[in-house]
Amino acid sequence: GSNRTVLLRNERFDLEQQVAAGGASAADHVEFTVPAARADEFPVGTYDVAVELIMPDESDPRQSNHLGMVIAPNITSLPASVARDGNGDAQISISFTPELRAGQQVSLLLGNEEVLPESFTAPTSTLTFIARDTEAGNRLARLRIDGVDSPIVDRSMDPPTFFNLRIDIT
């Protein structure tokens, strides 16, 4: 069909957004990308997704069935290493997209350790975490917002590879 539009609804934030379908869309699938300029309009969370399109020889749009989709946080800036202070605390500042909204729960996972952020004002796309009395070592870092973890695998590569989201705590 033509005039394909992807409809996204996030009930928690009472959001309804539309994104033009593009890419290699075909009769059996649709591809779309949230435009970078609009990333903050799509908070991390679960979305109900449908496609609206006009079928050949028809003038009224039809809507597909609805499917679930998750938008995950993406770490955009992470220090390669941080030094612990005299108490064994490591301060880690990160940047990410999309912005954290008021009411969302957030933590930084460092290996098996979950660290809560220092105080912040939402919306924000940067946070500081202090891993208290933490051990030295090279840790895999993930950002968790409302139970959704930032990806650690780059599935655009063949074969898939791990993102280099590690922090060396000294």
Predicted regions and their residues:
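Short beta-strand segments of immunoglobulin-like
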Residues: 78-86
